[in-house]
Design a protein with these regions (language model features):
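Flexible glycine/proline-enriched surface loops and loop-helix/loop-strand junctions
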Residues: 2-3, 118, 174-178
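Substrate-binding cleft of carbohydrate-active enzyme catalytic domains
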Residues: 1, 17, 21, 191
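An aromatic- and glycine-enriched ligand-binding surface/loop that stacks and positions planar moieties
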Residues: 7-156
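Residues that mark the junctions of alpha-helical repeat units in TPR/alpha-solenoid scaffolds
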Residues: 3, 10, 184-188
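C-terminal substrate/ligand-recognition segments
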Residues: 131-191
């Protein structure tokens, strides 16, 4: 139900079980889980489907959309100042994944700390016109060509950073520590 977002559903349990079986690589369990996954995909009771525009999938208005099987909920209204870990109500990973020194002329993205840069190998694995590439990765040269700035003075600089979980204007807390309280949900399992 819409008022119970964040609760594990039967669909989420089936999808997680499928992940476990795949990692176990146990042929004796594959047929059973394949049957359950087929039901998950074809039974309209589950109501999962792809959204038409992949580019908006990681925007906050598409959290828990029909493509989402399971997400970890986060909120920007937590009054957390706890650096100890995942006890925060907000998503502290977001600030770490954002590009350092980023200034966006469109005021969509805000500066992060530049951790976990995207590798060139991952960037190059996408076909040039694949919409998943634009949604997943910020190419710093392309970003600069569009009038933005990004610092290259960071450890392990690659020229690429994560877009789908990049800090965005208006997504962080005005209550607790801003860096610890981004509202971006983590999409654990998508359809």
């Amino acid at each position: 139900p819409a008022n119970e977002k964040g609760r594990a559903t039967n669909g989420a349990a089936i999808a997680m079980k499928a992940r476990i079986v795949l990692y176990q690589n146990d042929d004796t369990k594959m047929k059973e889980i394949a049957s359950q996954l087929k039901e998950l995909i074809t039974d309209p009771a589950y109501q999962y489907d792809l959204i038409p525009d992949y580019k908006v999938l990681f925007d906050d208005e598409y959290e828990w959309c029909k493509e989402s099987v399971f997400e970890v909920n986060y909120t920007e209204i937590g009054n957390s100042n706890d650096w100890a870990g995942k006890a925060n109500q907000g998503n502290s990973d977001i600030i770490m994944l954002g590009a350092r020194g980023l200034k966006d002329p469109n005021n969509v993205y805000v500066e992060g700390w530049g951790f976990a840069p995207v590798t060139k190998a991952l960037n190059d694995a996408f076909l040039p016109n694949d919409p998943r590439k634009w949604t997943t990765i910020i190419d710093h040269e392309e970003f600069r060509a569009e009038g933005g700035t990004v610092s290259s003075d960071v450890n392990q600089y690659t020229g690429y950073s994560v877009r789908k979980y990049h800090p965005r204007a208006g997504y962080s807390s005005t209550v607790g520590t801003e860096a610890l309280n981004y509202k971006n949900n983590y999409r654990v399992i998508r359809f």
